[in-house]
Amino acid sequence: MADTILEVKNLKKYFKTARGTLHAVDDVSFTIERGKTLGIVGESGCGKSTTGRAILRLLEPTSGKVVFDGKDITSLSAAEMRKMRSDMQIIFQDPFSSLDPRKTVSQTIAEPIIENKILKDKKAIEARVKELMETVGLAQRLVNTYP
């Protein structure tokens, strides 16, 4: 059985507006295994940032459940949530400044693997980069190109 670090169940975040109710996040569910990373990608205004903020309770969810490291954090107090956030991270990226134009696609993908000492062997890092590129649909011919 996989070791789940984050489980999000039926997360919703609605906002009242002059025109009615805006369903910014509507019934989002997913799990993340320990040691894995999740990227939420979508067009502007689709609810990516709101989803992240609701998970961290920087915005209170309208409904749903968030379980972090086996603990339901949905009903934690503000003080407990502040402490819990030290173990959680969300990175909001500006697509125009998120890629270093001096690094190849391969170097960019390998950087967190190397920095976090996930793998040390050069061949293993190269294999993981290749695997990750395949996972997200990046052609291998792009491995040594620049953004």
Regions found by a protein language model. Name each.
Residues 41-42:
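The feature captures the beta-strand-to-loop junction immediately N-terminal to the Walker
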Residues 56:
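Helix-to-loop junction immediately C-terminal to a conserved catalytic motif
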Residues 2-5, 14-27, 34, 77-80, ...:
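A short, flexible loop at the N-terminus of ABC-type nucleotide-binding domains that lies
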Residues 72, 123-141:
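Conserved ABC ATPase "signature" region
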Residues 64-72:
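Conserved ABC transporter NBD signature motif
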Residues 45, 49-50:
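Conserved Walker
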Residues 96, 102-115, 126, 130, ...:
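Short helical segment in ABC ATPase nucleotide-binding domains corresponding to the A-loop/adjacent helical element
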Residues 19, 73-89, 115, 122:
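ABC ATPase NBD coupling module
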